[in-house]
Structure formats: C-alpha cells, structure tokens
A protein has these predicted regions:
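Mobile cap/lid helix-loop segments that gate and shape the active-site cleft of serine hydrolases
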Residues: 225, 231-271
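Non-catalytic accessory segments flanking enzyme active sites
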Residues: 4, 11-111, 133, 137-140, ...
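Short beta-strand/loop motif that positions the catalytic acidic residue
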Residues: 269, 275-277, 281
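Cap/lid segment of the alpha/beta-hydrolase catalytic domain
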Residues: 79-199, 206-207, 212, 239-242
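C-terminal catalytic histidine-bearing segment of alpha/beta-hydrolase fold enzymes
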Residues: 290, 297-344
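Short glycine-enriched nucleophile-adjacent loop
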Residues: 210-221
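Conserved alpha/beta-hydrolase "acid-adjacent" motif
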Residues: 282-290
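Short beta-strand immediately N-terminal to the catalytic nucleophile in serine-hydrolase-like folds
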Residues: 203-205, 230, 276
Length: 344
C-alpha cells in the first residue's frame, strides 16, 4: 500500500510510503495553488506522471524526470489563457427543513462584496446520484460563466452521492419537490450572503440538472428569472428504462424516481426557458425536450435547440462545446426574462 485517497470537497491523497510522500509533497510545493495528483510512475520512480488543476486551470499533465526536472506534456484545454477565472469555496447552508446542504460557490476572480451582488446561476449537477468536486469543472461551464461575470452555486442537493448516506437517501421520491427546495434555498442563501442579486437569478442544468431547470419553469414560487435546461428529463412517467442499462439499478433505484412531474404541471409554467439537446442523445431522448416545449411555448417565452450530431455524454466534439456555450451566453444576454441579463 502506497497511500489512500479520501473523497472530500476534492480528492485528497495521503501517501504512507515515504518516497511517494516525499515526491508528492515536493510537487505540491512547486504547484501550491493547484491540486496535484500522481497518475503513474515507473520502477525506481525516475519517471513520475502527474496532473495539476485548479478551479481556474484545466488539467495539465507533467512528467517528473529523475526527481529534479519537470517536463509539461500538455493540457486538456490549451486555448484557455493562464490567468485566474474563479474564486471558489466549499460551503454549507440550511434547507428549509433543517437538512445541511453542501455546495460549491464560484465567483469571478477578484470580486469583493463591496462590488455589489452578482447575477447568479444555480447549477445543479446531473445524476442525480452523483456530486461535484472543487477544482476544475470538467464541463467547463463554471469557469465560462464566472469569466462572464456570473456567480455560480453548485448545490449538492439531497440525493447526491458521496456526501453521506443521510443526504443521499433524503432524495428518494423527491424529484421536483424537496430536491428542488434545496436549489431554491441555496439561491436564497446566496442572496442573504450578499453574493447574488435576487432579480438576476438563473437555473442552468444538464441531464438531471436539466430536469431541475424544467421543474423550476412550472414551480409556482420559483425565484429564477429564466431556466436553461440541457438534455432534460421532463416526463417521469415515461422515464422508464432509458436512464440506465443496468437492470438491477433500474429495478431497485428506479423505485425512488418519483415526485413532481414537470409534464403534468405545465399549466403553472411561468418562467422563460431555453431547452437544448443533442439529436444523438439516447439517455435523455430529444422527445423529452420537444414535448415539454410544445406544452409551455404558449404560456412562457420558450426556445428549443437540437444540437447536430451531439450525444448525451462528454467528451463532445470541440464544435459542440463552442455551439452550446454561445447558445447559453446569447440566451442569458438577450432572452433571460424580459431583456436578458449580463454578467459583465
């Protein structure tokens, strides 16, 4: 055994092997503001492959040679300039029923409370049986938004995995209900902390996060000005077998997929919405977005975009990232609520 890794706000590795611990500690001193992960090595440790990343810096891969020389091999997104994009912190806030909800707050680098509250994106993760980590956001959405002047809250709402059994099981049967409360309570907390402008709140999510955005559209007391729903589930009754190829998971965990169904509540739609989905998406097929759009388009300003040749899961082609980021930015600037909102 060389060491062990604990899943906290990020993955934290502790080496019990003396040589590996020495190498790891040395690398952390060279890259003090980044996460350092050793990914491979040769016999004798004369060659050690490691990765660095932070909330502002995408994963970059390096080779430590003879323990005294570092050769940088490449970055996941080399076109991103080397400057700070995000001030990030792990937080906790109380839901309305008292449950403690973890979250990640990301702010434009250098923002101070004296600068005034920011337009804020509530950004629930997919899954919902998943979670977010601090450090580089692999989707690229968070640093993109903060670079445009938005604050971002990533609530680890009930149902999230990897943050304790109590939080995980509290989401059973609560789609669109208490799981949605956690998002709205996070928005309220951001406002109370002076970070969020209550008149410029947005929800943006993908996959389950897209469901949450659709649920916000029909939620009578939703605090958001608009919703961006990527690759959403919108009809729980028709979710069926599309969400997992694992039969045991469908039978066991499928029993927990219950709650408020957006498609059955479109008569209460009152939040403008952008829906987008890849035309090759088989996990959340495009009919979810299409059917929801047809039901709400005469009640609220609604836009539907089918992205050519895009599947559900990343990695996508470069053009898919460019197209969807332009779509999101344009919608926020021009169509979010009456007149749009702008981060900067």
């Amino acid at each position: 055994v060389l060491g062990f890794t604990v899943s906290g706000p990020t993955f934290e590795t502790t080496y019990v092997d003396g040589e590996m611990r020495s190498i790891h500690e040395g690398l952390k001193q060279v890259y003090p503001d980044q996460n350092v992960r050793i990914t491979d090595y040769n016999d004798g440790l004369s060659r050690v492959l490691f990765q660095t990343d932070s909330a502002s810096h995408p994963p970059t891969y390096h080779l430590l040679i003879d323990r005294n020389k570092v050769k940088t091999l490449g970055s996941q997104r080399p076109w991103i300039e080397d400057h700070e994009l995000v001030d990030e912190k792990w937080v906790y806030y109380a839901a309305r029923d008292g449950l403690e909800i973890p979250g990640i707050v990301s702010l434009p680098a250098g923002w101070k409370k004296s600068d005034g509250p920011l337009p804020t994106v509530i950004h629930p993760h997919g899954g919902p049986w998943a979670r977010d980590y601090t450090g580089w956001d692999f989707s690229g959405w968070v640093p993109f938004l903060t670079s445009r002047g938005y604050a971002v809250l990533q609530p680890q709402y009930r149902g999230s995995q990897g943050l304790g059994r109590k939080l995980w099981l509290a989401g059973d049967g609560e789609w669109g209900q208490s799981m949605q409360d956690d998002l709205d309570d996070g928005a309220k907390w951001m406002t109370e902390q002076g970070m969020a402008d209550p008149e410029r709140l947005v929800i943006f999510g993908y996959s389950y996060g897209g469901f949450a955005a659709a649920a916000a559209v029909v939620r009578p007391d939703s605090p958001v000005r608009c919703a961006i729903s990527g690759a959403p589930v919108t009809d729980l009754d028709r979710l069926g077998v599309t969400w997992s190829s694992n039969r045991t998971q469908r039978l066991m965990q499928g029993q927990t997929v219950k709650g408020k169904n957006p498609m059955e509540n479109t008569d209460t739609a009152h939040v403008p919405v952008l829906l987008y989905v890849g035309d090759r998406d088989v996990r959340t097929p495009s009919w979810h977005a299409k059917n929801f759009y047809k039901k709400v388009k005469d009640r609220v300003p609604a836009k539907l975009v089918l992205v050519d040749d895009m599947p559900h899961q990343m990695p996508w082609y470069y053009r898919h990232h460019v197209e969807t980021l332009k779509l999101i930015e344009g919608y926020l600037n021009n169509d979010c609520g009456p007149g749009g909102i702008r981060g900067s």
